[in-house]
Amino acid sequence: MRALAPSFRLLAGLLLLIVLSLSSANAQCNFANSCTGVELYGYILRGDCINEDGHPHATSINLNYYIGNDNGRLEYPGESFGSSCVKTALNDGHTLTASCKGADGQYHDSSMDLNYVVGNSYGYMEPCRASNADHVLKSSSE
């Protein structure tokens, strides 16, 4: 039985590392779970996000660097949605809404869940990794 103990400890340690790495990968998004007082000022998302010590940290991110407009629809990854989208607003603390100009010259209402775009990294709002972009390559048009 003692011969199994070191192998079991090694296996348990490896399993713990795998679980921790998976949970940290998921922690890159869903900023709304750990950020409060979130508001949108133009293209700047601001709020207080919990840091590694468990304390709130005032932080912001310029969404214009990470979100674009594809024919009247908000798109991530992308950039410069602000040049062709108007009436930007934040609903429910995590849903970006805007009216974006399409190829037809008309404006189309669009929305995007920012939990797939923004994460909390040690108290700082940061863009999600590109692998998470598969969830929101194109946003919904209403």
Curated annotation (Swiss-Prot):
Signal found in the keyword field: yes
Stored SMART domains: CVNH
Signal peptide feature range: 1-27
SUPFAM superfamilies: Cyanovirin-N
Disulfides per UniProt: 29-128, 35-49, 85-100
MF-aspect GO terms: carbohydrate binding
Protein origin, superkingdom: Eukaryota
Family note: Belongs to the cyanovirin-N family.
Function: Mannose-binding lectin.
Name of the protein in question: Cyanovirin-N homolog
Species assigned in the record: Ceratopteris richardii (Triangle waterfern)
